[in-house]
Amino acid sequence: MFKRLTSLLRFACIFGVSLLTAGILMAQDCPRGTLDSRFCDRDGDLVADAPTDPSEWVNPDTLIFVYTPVEDPAVYKTAWADFITHMEKVTGKKIRYFIIQSNAAQIEAMRSGRIHVAGFNTGSNPLAVNCAGFVPFTIMASLDGNFGYEMEIITYPGSGINKVEDIKGRNLAFTSPTSNSGFKAPSAILKAEFDMLPDRDFEPTFSGKHDNSILGVANKDYDAASIANSVKSRMIKRNVIKAEDVITIYKSQTFPTTGFGYVHNLHPDVAKKVQEAFSSFEWDKPDGTPTSLKVEFEKSNEGQFLPITYQEHWAVIRTIDKANNVSYACK
């Protein structure tokens, strides 16, 4: 009896290892580029394909929507209210707007299946795509079709900083390590154009968010900061700061702004409805009054959603990441 039990256990172990090995081989048996091993990219567009097995699709009664954590979360919950109502009508689903406090938490929430539709900030898009299976498809743009923002390095009047080189020996506020304009782009630019490195040439600090950095400079808590000028524009128009409270000493090329999309395993029919919700949204109500989304985002000259692809529109961001030796591996 003991010998028989031992044989059965040995068989079970061998069979289990065989299944595990087969599972690993199956996971590896598809092209994926830099995507996490859970995903496949058979069409080569750099984003995760929908699962081929329909049983892996998610089709919840309530879709969780998260907007990139910038500025005051309460402001943006109000701003997205009319759009949420529109998306509910188009998808036939309940939509819950969920407030999240950091870029890393947003990526982890999508990776673990807790959010389905999201707007990820510029710098977080590559990690969200590669680690969480995010599929971006649209971006906010002005009515003339222009879109994007610039990274600015700002200081306050009377700081003694008139050009980038003057930051040497002073402190410079970044936002978070995953932010393009708040960390990755300025890091690459400071090194390449000015031969300036954190700790060696200036004291780096992280404020957490763009509005924290902007307010920190305006209040003279930071000598300088790297920020997204679209956030600065909205803060000025909301009278959070005055335009004269800060001075721009560097302005970058234009970068794509927040990318909106869905998680890769969202039921394809639902994913199509989500895309339709963005493309069909009218920024003015039938009576001609502006929607809550327009009221907020016209402050940064945005008034429509335009289709984009991660492969094309985030190429410059991937180049910056490569220069900074950024890894897209899940942590």
Regions of interest found by a model, annotated:
Residues E88-I99, E193-S207, K242-D245, S327-C330:
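A local structural motif
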Residues F11-A22:
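Bacterial N-terminal signal peptides
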